[in-house]
Amino acid sequence: MSIKSDKWIRRMAEQHGMIEPFAPGQVREQDGRKIVSYGTSSYGYDIRCADEFKIFTNINSTIVDPKNFDEKSFVDFKGDVCIIPPNSFALARTMEYFRIPRSVLTICLGKSTYARCGIIVNVTPFEPEWEGYVTLEFSNTTPLPAKIYAGEGCAQVLFFESDEVCETSYRDRGGKYQGQHGVTLPKT
């Protein structure tokens, strides 16, 4: 299994719609102002956060249960900047829609710009033949409120291609998050 380069990422995005919308290079400025970068890097793709958020609140629930998650545990927010309360978290989604090839698995890691501020981005791997908008989780590990910027980079996706195509893909087994569009809560 080998990591894929910028040339491969560009080719797969432009010819096969693997990433839409797609930035073929690194974008570091918008409208003359510096931003958290996004787009193609040497061996990955820096994804952007959309302006749809679900901010965790503990006023409506007493326990967090991934098998029986209460939607009232979140407050919906739409905007260019999301403020995450201290020691809390928020969910968001990517601006990019992904179509992962059958021979590819991705790993997604948070950007150091956020990590250096105590904001951890968590995303599970994108499995072979998964497609959809990615649900992102931002944890604010600090005792202060923290900002997340919509339309800017937040994590990097690394693409790994196997020497052998998998027997059963995410699509084949009817994965529960296949084709997700909005910020998607836990499912069982």
From Swiss-Prot:
EC number(s) from the headed UniProt entry: 3.5.4.13
Keyword vocabulary terms for this entry: Hydrolase, Nucleotide metabolism, Nucleotide-binding
Ligand binding (dCTP): K111, S112, T113, Y114, A115, R116, T135, L136, E137, Q156, Y170, Q180
Function: Catalyzes the deamination of dCTP to dUTP.
Reaction equation(s) it catalyzes: dCTP + H2O + H(+) = dUTP + NH4(+)
Native source organism of the sequence: Cupriavidus necator (strain ATCC 17699 / DSM 428 / KCTC 22496 / NCIMB 10442 / H16 / Stanier 337) (Ralstonia eutropha)
Protein family (similarity comment): Belongs to the dCTP deaminase family.
Pathway in which the depicted protein is active: Pyrimidine metabolism; dUMP biosynthesis; dUMP from dCTP (dUTP route): step 1/2
Quaternary data: Homotrimer.
One MF annotation (Gene Ontology) recorded for this entry: dCTP deaminase activity
Domain of life the protein comes from: Bacteria
BP GO annotations: dUMP biosynthetic process; dUTP biosynthetic process; nucleobase-containing small molecule interconversion
Gene designation: dcd
HAMAP family: dCTP_deaminase
SUPFAM superfamilies: dUTPase-like (SSF51283)
InterPro entries: dCTP_deaminase, dUTPase-like_sf, dUTPase_trimeric
CDD domains reported for this sequence: trimeric_dUTPase
Identification of the protein by name: dCTP deaminase
